[in-house]
UniProtKB/Swiss-Prot annotation:
One of its GO terms (biological process) is regulation of cell shape. This is UDP-N-acetylmuramate--L-alanine ligase. It catalyses: UDP-N-acetyl-alpha-D-muramate + L-alanine + ATP = UDP-N-acetyl-alpha-D-muramoyl-L-alanine + ADP + phosphate + H(+). Its main location: cytoplasm. Cell wall formation. Belongs to the MurCDEF family. SUPFAM superfamilies: MurCD N-terminal domain, MurD-like peptide ligases, catalytic domain, MurD-like peptide ligases, peptide-binding domain. It comes from Dictyoglomus thermophilum (strain ATCC 35947 / DSM 3960 / H-6-12). Pathway: Cell wall biogenesis; peptidoglycan biosynthesis.
């Protein structure tokens, strides 16, 4: 796969990087990595014999054959600079994943939202059908004990990252497109460029491959007529190949009948709530059908699925019967889906939201404000930059002002950091509330701080 046996990952604690490092270690490479932080992923890598360095230094890469980086690594990173000066081959994360997708029949999940959950569901369906897939997922999946697994079977299941166009490097045998939405506009500029990228990815699917599309997404419907000479199936709530009907939604999950072209296949029960998760499961059922897998084993896999870390994840109960949840959602569509789902609990909804990136806040502050209006109380933290440089005039106040203007009755507060957020939460919580920490940054620490002060061992209806 790679020239040389010694591979070093700069920024190894990241979800995508740690998964690739794990796969490389499992394949027998001598792997090392560095990061400014350690987490559960680096602990797991250490158990596999991976050398983990805290912080960055040229000394870490003196004897390596290849250096792997992601888009999050700045060009002035000292290890990156040293690797260039010594002509050590530097590989982008997406190039390494692309190499892996050449080795097996690869099922690539792309789209603005739902990639991690959809990839996880598909992975578990393949696992339950004993195909022993290789799995690379963008979150912690309890069922495989992490975010990656090297299998001996013919399939690989992985997420494709469209944020910087690198999904175009991958080699899908089957491509799943969960949706196309206005995101990463700093890279794409407009929705038409995003649609064009997905059409180009679809073109990469081989003659004997397949495309699986969410027909409920308008932007996908816009491009479907432009797909040429590809075998494709659709899923959605109506007018699609795979559909769901007779739906029962509650806070502990859902039940529904699944149909293929109006022929009932069976009834499905999910332990993860929300209409969006029904859609995610339909894509997994679609993959099962395409690959000719056993339907009963597929349903059993979906019924066992407890979710992915930081996706509507139940964290615990604190005093006065307050439920604490955490979610990764940071785009308006994701925020809306999460809040609609948690509304099923019929509790007052207190949301601590941390905007993610200055560019996303600049482009989508109005839409974020609209999505947050489903809350009863909003506590707005400052923007989590994710390495971006500040944009003059762009801050959380943009969202705050939009909410004040359009939803003056909504209780909303601006805070600066984790400590202020936790303090404000304690002052506004009432008996029986539901507290949600929301965002792709470190907002989850607010919930953890409160739980550390008084977590109760109480059973609730939805436990993941």
């Amino acid at each position: 796969m790679l020239n040389g046996k010694r591979i070093h990952f700069i920024g190894v604690a990241g979800t995508g990087m740690s998964a690739l490092a794990y796969i490389c270690a499992e394949k027998g490479y001598e792997v090392s990595g560095s990061d400014i932080q350690e987490n559960i992923s680096t602990i797991r890598l250490k158990s596999k014999g991976v050398k983990i360095y805290r912080g960055h230094s040229p000394e870490h890469i003196n004897d390596v054959d290849v250096v792997v980086v992601s888009s999050a690594i700045p060009p002035d990173n000292e290890e990156y600079v040293y690797a260039k000066s010594k002509n050590i081959p530097i590989l982008h994360r997406s190039d390494l994943l692309a190499e892996l997708t050449k080795e097996k029949k690869s099922i690539i999940v792309g789209g603005a939202h739902g990639k991690t959950t959809t990839t996880s569901m598909i992975a578990l369906v393949l696992e339950n059908n004993k195909t022993d897939p290789t799995i690379i997922v963008g979150g912690e999946l309890e069922d495989i004990g992490g975010n990656a697994k090297l299998g001996s079977g013919e399939y690989l299941v992985a997420e494709g990252d469209e944020s910087d166009g690198s999904i175009l490097k991958l080699n899908p045998y089957i491509l799943v497109v969960t949706n196309i939405d206005n995101d990463h506009l700093d890279y794409y500029e407009n929705i038409e460029n995003i649609k064009s990228t997905f059409l180009k990815v679809i073109e990469k699917v081989p003659e004997d491959g397949y495309v699986l599309l969410n027909l409920d997404c308008k932007n996908i419907r816009d491009i479907i007529g432009k797909i040429k000479d590809k075998k494709y199936y659709t899923y959605g709530f109506s007018n699609a190949d795979f559909t769901a009907d007779n739906i029962v939604l509650n806070s502990s999950g859902s039940e529904f009948d699944v149909y293929f072209r109006n022929v009932k296949l069976g009834r499905v029960k999910l332990k993860v709530p929300g209409r969006h998760n029904i859609l995610n499961s339909l894509s997994a059922i679609g993959i099962s059908y395409i690959l000719g897998l056993d339907f009963e084993q597929t349903i059993k896999a979906l019924e066992k699925f407890h979710g992915v870390q930081r996706r509507i994840q139940f964290k615990g109960v604190i005093e006065n019967d307050v439920l604490v949840f955490d979610d990764y959602g940071h785009h308006p569509t994701e925020i809306l889906a999460t809040l609609e789902t948690l509304r099923l609990y019929n509790r007052r909804l207190v949301v601590v939201f941390q905007p993610h990136r200055y560019t996303r806040t600049y482009f989508l502050s109005k839409e974020i404000a609209d999505a947050l209006s489903l809350s009863d109380v909003v506590i707005l933290m400052e923007i989590y930059s994710a390495g971006e440089k500040p944009i003059p005039g762009v801050s959380s106040r943009n969202i705050y002002d939009e909410i004040k203007k359009k939803y003056p009755e909504l209780e909303i507060y601006l805070v600066n950091d984790i400590v202020e957020a936790a303090t404000k939460v304690k002052s506004v919580l009432r008996d029986g509330d539901l507290l949600l920490t929301l965002g792709a940054g470190n907002v989850w620490k607010v919930g953890e701080a409160l739980l550390a002060q008084g977590k109760k061992d109480v059973n609730v209806e939805y436990s993941q």
